[in-house]
Amino acid sequence: MKYILMMTGTKAQFDWYAKWSRQDLQAQFAFMHAFNKELRESGVLVATEGLAFPAEAKVVRAGLNGEPITDGVFPESKEFLAGYWIIDVESPERAYEIAARASMAPGPGGQPSNMPIEVRQIVSAASNS
């Protein structure tokens, strides 16, 4: 079964990154690199990407009496997508285990960042299981 694991955050959480020490940032990047490598080598990783900050996003609509392209994420959004993993695992429980490990990425002082990871089954995969 395929799942998407979505790391979300608020603007305040990501503004917080600017205050992290270089060592703390390097520790988090090293964790993510090792985590992704482990998923890839175990054969469960389909794809993973980190995303640019929301200020760089564009929202595109069909038009119809409005601007078809606007800056940023939806203004009413409190959270935004920071990155994702697509995994192919045998059970929802395995997807939850992997999501919990992703949430353990170190934050300042090496403490787990506890970032929320939303887990959703990919619909096309649901019909094949």
PLM features per residue range, with description:
Residues 1-129:
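Conserved, structured core segments of small domains
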